[in-house]
């Protein structure tokens, strides 16, 4: 009867004849057990003798003799032996279960619990019963149902199954319709609907249909007559109706004109036309004095003031011959000329502040100082959190949002928020279906220009990132950062199961598979192994049922 009870679990897997072997099987020859073990490991549909797998390390062998020779070495490495049948185990829970089967197997009563004396017909029922006794030793308790767990991760998985989802807080309420939202930007987008409705109603009242016939005669009234189109939100007036329509988009947030290159949106078409010159490189406004070209007309007007100022200062300066005739009047300031203006044409160009490194000129000295930091590498603005230095204050402000978590730039399509406007502009291209950046060599298209630049290095063979330690060059900066860890000895990827750390993430992934082969996530009831703990928890539900 005992032999029948102990022989039953062998159908569940190759590890069961060793794990739950009774006293009557101690005298059996090892080669017979190994031969049975090798046959049980054969997959269906294969001829006998083709595949034999070790129950401990899952290694496969072509014949049972090779398996038997390997098993002697494999068992010798297992640290925990059973004193009843000399069976060895890698983990203490497996040995404890194995010893309980030896102690509980009684021919007449079946399997008896050594703690409370309860008897069971099968060993699986005994193991499930023993888990109830061991539950009191688990340190983590569920606050809802008093169930205990070994790990915090098991408690979190249990709470997700048992506790109902907490409703999301929606503190932002619309004052017009009472609808609530979880985030402020969602409420702002929603309120545009009410603003558009109010604009339509106000436009229908203020801009009603004019009676047919001759146009109405101008009436005295000043701005109301000259600018008949008034905004219902802010009261601003316009001469033409298209200007009013374009102005309404300031209140509604509508931006119908989208750039096909980068996806940025604008309220007016002239803004889009001016923006597209950044991508095309067009500079239609030339300077008549020096020939320099500008992308926008305001930039040309600002630049032309430099030439006018130089021309006025040159005309106000005295003739060079007057230095020889009358030197004393030179000490008096000329009429109509500021005290700080230059005196000679040779000194006139001093108004332009030129960079001594690259020759670039600037109108103000502070602009020159900001520019010279690019050559000197000076970074006077330091972050108080991490100590990182920046050359411009705007860069420090943008970096500080990394520590504060502030993300003021929100996407209108999906609501995702970003800490910098450039990141939002790059994200908008993900919503655009087109891929404007096309490789001229192979025709592959990309959404972002940096991706195209990195791809083109494949065709050109360019490797601009050079290691300062060994001189090895790379095409991408991430590869250089990963390579430099060889020289610095940095190992940022640590294994959570042991004390080893690695310089590459791929090496950590390969290393963690060794823990899985050792049975890191192994079921204590049936011995089945899993790649991660979540799958093990899902598997244990079958035994609980």
From Swiss-Prot:
Keyword Cytoplasm in annotation: yes
Task: Tell me the residues on which N6-acetyllysine occurs.
Answer: 39, 269
Q: Which gene encodes it?
A: Repin1
Point out which parts of the chain are C2H2-type zinc fingers, as ranges. 52-74, 80-102, 111-133, 140-162, 172-194, 229-251, 257-279, 285-307, 353-375, 381-403, 409-431, 437-459, 465-487, 493-515, 521-543
Taking the first listed entry, what is the main subcellular location of this protein, grouped into a coarse class? nucleus
PANTHER family recorded for this chain? Answer: ASPARAGINE-RICH ZINC FINGER PROTEIN AZF1, ZINC FINGER PROTEIN
Q: Which InterPro entries match?
A: Znf_C2H2_sf, Znf_C2H2_type
GO molecular function annotation: sequence-specific DNA binding; zinc ion binding
What ranges does the record give for the region Disordered, renumbered to this chain?
1-50
**Protein's UniProt name:** DNA-binding protein REPIN1
One cellular-component annotation, GO? cytosolic ribosome
């Amino acid at each position: 009867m005992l032999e029948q009870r102990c022989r039953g679990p062998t159908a569940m897997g190759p590890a069961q004849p060793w794990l739950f072997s009774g006293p009557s099987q101690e005298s059996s020859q090892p080669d017979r057990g190994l031969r049975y073990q090798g046959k049980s490991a054969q997959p269906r549909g294969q001829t006998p003798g083709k595949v034999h797998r070790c129950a401990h390390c899952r290694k496969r062998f072509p014949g049972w003799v090779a398996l038997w020779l390997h098993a002697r070495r494999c068992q010798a490495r297992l640290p925990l032996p059973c004193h009843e049948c000399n069976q060895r185990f890698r983990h203490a829970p497996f040995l404890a279960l194995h010893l309980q089967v030896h102690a509980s197997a009684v021919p007449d009563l079946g399997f008896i619990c050594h703690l409370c004396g309860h008897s069971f017909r099968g060993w699986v029922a005994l193991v499930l019963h023993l888990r109830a006794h061991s539950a009191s030793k688990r340190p983590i308790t569920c606050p809802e149902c008093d169930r205990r767990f070994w790990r915090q991760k098991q408690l979190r998985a249990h709470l997700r199954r048992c506790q109902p989802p907490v409703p999301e807080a929606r503190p932002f309420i619309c004052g017009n319709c009472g609808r609530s939202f979880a985030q402020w930007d969602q409420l702002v987008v929603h309120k545009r609907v009410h603003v558009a409705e109010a604009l339509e109603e106000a436009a229908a009242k203020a801009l009603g249909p004019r009676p047919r016939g001759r146009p109405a005669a101008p009436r005295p009234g000043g701005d109301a007559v000259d600018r008949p189109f008034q905004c219902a939100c802010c009261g601003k007036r316009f001469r033409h109706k298209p200007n009013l329509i374009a102005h309404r988009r300031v209140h509604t947030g509508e931006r119908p004109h989208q750039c096909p290159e980068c996806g940025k949106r604008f309220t007016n078409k002239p803004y889009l036309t001016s923006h597209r010159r950044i991508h095309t490189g067009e500079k239609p406004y030339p300077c008549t004095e020096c020939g320099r070209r500008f992308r926008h007309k305001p930039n040309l007007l600002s630049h032309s003031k430099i030439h006018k100022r130089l021309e006025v200062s040159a005309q106000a300066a005295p003739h060079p011959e007057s230095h020889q005739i009358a030197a004393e009047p030179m000490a008096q300031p000329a009429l109509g000329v500021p005290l700080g203006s230059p005196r000679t044409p040779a000194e006139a160009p001093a108004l332009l502040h030129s960079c001594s490194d690259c020759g670039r000129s600037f109108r103000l000295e502070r602009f020159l100082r900001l520019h010279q930091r690019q050559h000197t590498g000076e970074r006077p603005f330091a972050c108080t959190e991490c100590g990182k230095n920046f050359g411009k204050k705007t860069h420090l402000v943008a970096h500080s949002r990394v520590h504060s978590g502030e993300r003021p730039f929100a996407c209108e399509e999906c609501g995702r928020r970003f800490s910098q406007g450039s990141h939002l502009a790059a994200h908008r291209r993900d919503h655009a279906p087109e891929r404007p950046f096309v490789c001229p060599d192979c025709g592959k298209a990309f959404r972002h220009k940096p991706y195209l630049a990195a791809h083109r290095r494949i065709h050109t063979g360019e490797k601009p990132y050079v290691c300062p330690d060994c001189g090895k060059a790379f095409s991408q900066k991430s590869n250089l950062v990963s390579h430099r860890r060889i020289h610095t000895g940095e190992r940022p990827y640590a294994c959570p199961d042991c004390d080893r750390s690695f310089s590459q993430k791929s090496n950590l992934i390969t290393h963690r598979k060794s823990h899985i082969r050792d049975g890191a996530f192994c079921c204590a009831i049936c011995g089945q192994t899993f790649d991660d703990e979540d799958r093990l928890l899902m598997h244990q539900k079958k035994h609980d049922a």
